[in-house]
């Protein structure tokens, strides 16, 4: 279900306007230091209004700490996660427009934004532009360097989005990236739940996720085989 909170809707519109003014509408021209400071002040006000925390405090918190702030009874608040991810992504784009796309701060902001937006999607935030936002961040943070935890988030995101083939790809990569028996058992548990759920769906619903009933059985067998190989190695 799309967001109906008026504050969040206004925030999304404000950051869209900010991006249009300083990034997408600049035809490749870098923004000035003064424009960067002005944008940071505007973003600071938006962080405070939506999350009750300053931009500086948000920067000091790691992804897990940020997610802890967004959780209620163990569940991530989807709308707040979405707006935080959008704010971080916007700040990353603005910093990159001044310092360059390879700037460490820009990369860090974009990676944090990606993690938060994946969690928002896994919590079924329902925003129509979420896929576009995630894909844009992936272009700036290629999967080759991702930690295992991000593939776990990607798996849950794609599963929640109904993109079952993509979810399975993330699942297998997650298995390859984790280390240790306990971590691999957690992947196996997630895989069993995933395939069990898919078997309850109609063929038409599986097809919408680029999957088939035969592929459910094949995927389960392939993952079990790879799991055994990793344990034996």
Please name every model-derived segment:
Residues 1-100, 107-125, 161-177, 201-233:
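N-terminal alpha-helical interaction modules that lie
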Residues 11, 144-151, 186:
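Generic helix N-cap/helix-start motif at coil->alpha-helix transitions
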Residues 2, 19, 156, 182-190, ...:
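Intrinsically disordered, low-complexity segments enriched in charged and polar residues
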Residues 128-142:
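Short, structured interface segments
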Residues 152-155, 159:
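Charge-dense, low-complexity intrinsically disordered regions
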Residues 82, 151-152:
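Alpha-helical tetratricopeptide repeat
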Residues 139-144, 174-180:
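Solenoid-like repeat scaffolds
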Residues 168, 184-204:
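Alpha-helical protein-protein interaction modules
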């Amino acid at each position: 279900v799309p967001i109906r909170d008026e504050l969040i809707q206004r925030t999304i519109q404000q950051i869209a306007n900010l991006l249009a003014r300083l990034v997408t509408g600049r035809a490749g021209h870098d923004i000035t230091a003064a424009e960067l400071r002005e944008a940071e002040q505007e973003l600071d006000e938006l962080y405070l209004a939506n999350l009750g925390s300053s931009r500086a405090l948000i920067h000091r918190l790691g992804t897990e700490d940020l997610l802890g702030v967004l959780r209620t009874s163990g569940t991530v608040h989807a709308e707040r996660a979405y707006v935080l991810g959008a704010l971080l992504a916007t700040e990353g784009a603005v910093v990159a427009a001044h310092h360059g796309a390879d700037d460490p701060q820009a990369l860090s902001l974009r990676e944090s934004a990606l993690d938060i937006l994946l969690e928002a999607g896994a919590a079924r935030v329902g925003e129509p532009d979420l896929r576009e936002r995630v894909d844009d961040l992936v272009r700036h943070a290629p999967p080759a360097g991702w930690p295992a935890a991000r593939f776990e988030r990607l798996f849950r995101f794609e599963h929640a989005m109904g993109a079952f083939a993509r979810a399975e790809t993330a699942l297998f990569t997650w298995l390859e990236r984790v280390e240790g028996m306990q971590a691999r058992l957690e992947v196996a548990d997630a895989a069993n739940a995933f395939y069990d759920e898919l078997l309850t769906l109609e063929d038409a619903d599986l097809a919408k996720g680029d999957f088939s009933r035969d592929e459910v059985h094949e995927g389960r067998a392939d993952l079990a085989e790879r799991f055994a190989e990793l344990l034996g190695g």
